[in-house]
C-alpha cells in the first residue's frame, strides 16, 4: 500500500466533539483569525492541508471500493469458478441448494404446462398429442435443471468470493487507521459545510428510505435478492421478522444520533429538521 504522507495534517483534522456546538466555536475561530496579522499565511497553509486531505481521502476511498471489487471478480472467475464447477459436476447429484429453488422451478414448469394447454384451447397453437406435450414439458424441465444448476454453482462462487472480498476490505481498514482518520475528518468537514436545510433534507431522505412507511417493500426485495445471491432459502417468516424489527432499531439509532450528537454540533440543523419533518 502506498505510504501516505500525513505529516502536514493539523490536529484540527482530528478534533472531537465538545460540549459547545461546533458551529459556535468555528465562528469564534474565524473571527479570531480575521484579527490575526498572520492570518494570510495560515489561510494558505490551511488550503494546502485541505487540498491534501481531500486528495488523500478520495484516493483511500477509491482504494476501499475498487480493491475488494477487483479481488471479488478475479477470485470468482479464475479461482473459485473452476473449483466449484469441478466439485459440483463430479461429486454433486443435486440440482437445488434449497427448497426455494425447487418451488420456483416447479412453479415455472407448471405455468409452462398450463400455457401450452391454454394456447391450444384458444387456437393460438395447433392441437398437440399428449406425447408431444410431454416432450415439450420434458425439454422445459431440462432447461430449468440446467438453469438452477448454474444458479446453485453461482451462489457458492458468490459466497466464497464475497468472503474473500470482505476479508480484503477489513485488512485495508485495519492497516489504514490513519487514512481512516483523515477520511473521517474529510467527511465531517463535508457534512458540516452543508447548509442546515441541506442537512435536514439528507436526514429526512435517508430516514424515509431506510425506516419510512414504504421502506418495508424495499427491505423485502433486498433480503430476497441477498438470500438468493448466496443460495440461502428465502424464508418468508425470517424476512418478515427482520422487516418488523431492524427498521425499528435503525430508527432508534437515527433518533439517538440526532439527540446525542447532531444536537451538539449543529443545533440549527436539528431545528430545521424538526420544522421540515412536521
UniProtKB/Swiss-Prot annotation:
Location of the protein in the cell: Plastid, Chloroplast inner membrane
Q: Which residues cross the membrane?
A: 60-80, 155-175, 201-221, 239-259
Reaction(s) catalyzed by this protein?
K(+)(in) + H(+)(out) = K(+)(out) + H(+)(in)
Q: Which domain of life is it from?
A: Eukaryota
What are the alphabetically sorted keywords of the record?
A: Antiport, Chloroplast, Hydrogen ion transport, Ion transport, Membrane, Plastid, Plastid inner membrane, Potassium, Potassium transport, Transmembrane, Transmembrane helix, Transport
Family that this chain belongs to: Belongs to the CemA family.
From the Swiss-Prot or TrEMBL record, give the protein name: Potassium/proton antiporter CemA
UniProt source species: Rhodomonas salina
